[in-house]
Each structure stands twice: as C-alpha cells, then as structure tokens.
Amino acid sequence: MNPLRLYNTLGRRIETFESFDPLTVKMYVCGPTVYDYVHIGHGRAFVGFDGIVRYLKLRGFNVIRVQNITDIDDKIIKRANETGKDWREIVDYYTKDYMESLKALKVEIDQHPRVTSHIQEIIDFVQKLVDKGHAYITSSGSVYFDVDSFPSYGLLSGSKKEEWNQGEEIVKEKKNPYDFALWKAWKPGEPYWESPWGKGRPGWHIECSTMSTRYLGEQFDIHGGGVDLVFPHHENERAQSESLLGKIWVKYWVHVAYLTINKEKMSKSLGNIIPLNEALKKWGPSVLRFWYLSTKYRNSIDYSEQTLEQARSSLQRLKDAMGIIRSVIKEEPKSHSNEEEISTQREIISLIGKFHEAMSNDFDTATALSNIYEIANLVFTKIQYTRDFMGAMLAFDAFRQFNYVFGVMDEEFSPSYETMYKVIDSVVEIRNILRARKMYDLSDEIRSVLANAGIKILDGKEKSTWRFE
C-alpha cells in the first residue's frame, strides 16, 4: 500500500500522513452559517471532504467527522432584521435546506454540533483564556483575544496580523486593532446569553475551537474548510486553541479551492450565486458529485453548463462499461485465459494500483479517475469482445473501489438492483428469441416498453444488450 501523503497548509508542503491514533482519523470541517441557502461552492467543500473521508475508510481507517452549524452570527441577526422574522426561524429554515442537501449528496457527518447548544462550554473556554492571560475583558463586556500573546500568529496563513481588516468590530476598546472578539457584548435587539461578563453572544472563531475540542479531544488530525477560511478564521482558531492547550492542536490543515462560475468569482453583487438545491434538481446528485470529484480538491473548479454536460456524459460511459462487465460476469467462465486476456488482466491490475497511487498522493481524484477511464476503455475495446471473465471480475473490483470513493454508481452495486438486472436480462433474452424467430413487431414493442422505463436496447449481430439511459 502506498504511503498516504497530503498537503498541509501549515507549512505549505506535502507531508506523510500519520494520525495521532494509527487506527482512527479525527476530522473537523467548518460548516455553514445558516442564514441563506447553501450554494454550489459549499457543495464543493462538502463533497471534497467526503471523498477524503471515503478514501481513508477504504484504506481501513475509522474516521470521525464533525461539521458544525453556526446558528448565531452577525449575518443571521442581519437577515432576521431585514425580513422581520425571528432569528430562530431563519436558522431552522436554512438548516433544513443544508441537511437536505447533504442527504441528497450522500455526505454523512458523524456529529453536527450547533453553536447555541454549546454556549456554556464556549463561556468556559473564554474564561480559561482570560485566566491564562491570553484574553482581556473590556468595559463594554466584550472579551478579546490578545494576539500579541501568541508569538506564532500568522504561521498558518502566512499573513501578518496588521493586514486583517476587521470591518465593524469596535477597534477603540481593544489593546490592538488586530485583536479579535471571543465574546461580543449585547446590543439592544440582539439575542443574548448570560455570562460572567454580562449579556452577550459568542464570537465567530471561538465556537469552532470549543466544539471541535468537545467532540474530538484536545488534539485531532485534520481541520478543514474552504480556502477562504485560512485567514482570519483558521488562524484565529489555532491561536486561541493552542494558547489554551499549550500544545499542537491540529496536525494537518486541509483546504478546498475556490469555485467560479463561467470563470467569474461567485458573489451576490454579480448575481451569479447558484443555490445547491437548484443544481441538485437540474443535474442530480450523482452528476454533481462526479463533477466535483473530477477535479482535485486543491484546484479551483469552474461551473458551466458545458462542464456539467461533460460530467454527465463521462459518468454515463462508466455506467455503460459497468453494464458490459455485468453481462460478461454472468456468463459461464472459460477454463483458462489466453495471452491477450492475460495482458488485459495485468493492465487492469496495474491501473488499480495507479488509482490508489493517485488517491494516496494528496487525494488526487482527477488522476485517480483517469485510470478508471482507462479501465473502462479496456472494457469497451477488449473485454466486450473477448468475454474475458477474469478481466471482467478485475474491472468490477476496480469500479467497486472507485464507487466507494466517488459515490456515483451506488445503484449498480445495490442488492435491489441485482434482482432488477436479472429481470431486465430475462426480458431482453425473450426479445432475442423473438428476433431470431423474426417476430419483429413484438420485439419492437418490447423495445418501446423498456425505453419508456429508461432502458435502452443495443442490438448486436447475434444478440442484444441493454443499458440505462
């Protein structure tokens, strides 16, 4: 098995992966702030990390994945004020959209902690930072992290603390303009919780430090998110967490690259934000997953009608190859393989190895997929005609491993589909008999019925095969 290597944003280099526990990988990924619909950029991160989790599991790791829900934040309060709705109504509505999108994309999360369910733990975390001299309380009741108390601040992002534009934060009550809020004092009309410093609510960065430590312990393996979170969010998380714990908090920082739309940055000002639920309705979960994972997670990806159509076509070709594989496997195996078949089998074994080599090299799904394409090509050009049983079995295993990671061909591997395949095979075989007897009207009628069910008949010289449309 190839050693597993991944790019660590902390250090900006490829490193050999070694989890704290050799059998378990603990991962925390920053989830959405639920004030609006999740969009296709969020979907890229959800599926990108899902591909990483799935490959880790394929290698035998037990993976614990935590992804938070930020359900109290400036943006949520602003949206509530704009709409005249209670902030909790806003949160519930968009949390439902988020959860439904995850389910559609077949992304499984072990823990989904919400900020408002961990207020006391956040308060305790902040108090400990105050006690250790890493945070200070202001006259307004806000609590700020003292960035100068953490000498390695900026190591993760490569940014200087002075570069941080903090927008609306109250600079005048801070020791330094770059200090950031751990606890925000209450303002009239805002939700609040009681604390030792008065009424208020958590700052953005403290919530992730608190909840990740709560569910994964004081040290865990992977902290992930979009590349836009490196600074200041993840930089601030690292500062406050390691200041409190006094040791390395996270081993590997992993970030997914930007998604653009027709080569332009996705933004509200350009009016080009595409809600994930709309993309799911248009393209379907499998095509979207396939499109996301066709590009390596650290490379930017551009959304366009053309690229999605290409993804749909490419996925269908793989499904067609799978149909041929199944048709060969159900035949009587030969007593031995000839030289041509043995050569094909060796090539498939080599390509399976290259698939794992690519996935082990910083989860390079794009290169891994290219090897699956080559196996599919062997199915179309060799196995389809030689009816090589062993070659088909090897290709079947390659597609099984591919689907374990990509999750785009689950139907082809589900038990219920085994029965359905047998039924369709029987119908097609009956049609072959009818064609042999030159009963073309009836055979054409069967073709029409199957077509209405989304099944396309492919007539050959001797017999017919089929595939899903």
Swiss-Prot record:
Catalytic activity entry: tRNA(Cys) + L-cysteine + ATP = L-cysteinyl-tRNA(Cys) + AMP + diphosphate
GO CC terms in record: cytoplasm
Gene behind the chain: cysS
Binding site for ATP: 268
Keyword tRNA-binding attributed: no
Similarity annotation: Belongs to the class-I aminoacyl-tRNA synthetase family.
Pfam families: tRNA-synt_1e (PF01406)
Cofactor(s) the protein needs: Zn(2+)
Listed name of the protein: Cysteine--tRNA ligase
EC number: 6.1.1.16
Subcellular location: Cytoplasm
Chief place where the protein resides: cytoplasm
Motif 'HIGH' region positions after renumbering to this chain: 32-42
CDD domains (UniProt xref): CysRS_core
Organism: Sulfolobus acidocaldarius (strain ATCC 33909 / DSM 639 / JCM 8929 / NBRC 15157 / NCIMB 11770)
Keyword ATP-binding: yes
Span(s) of short sequence motif 'KMSKS' region: 265-269
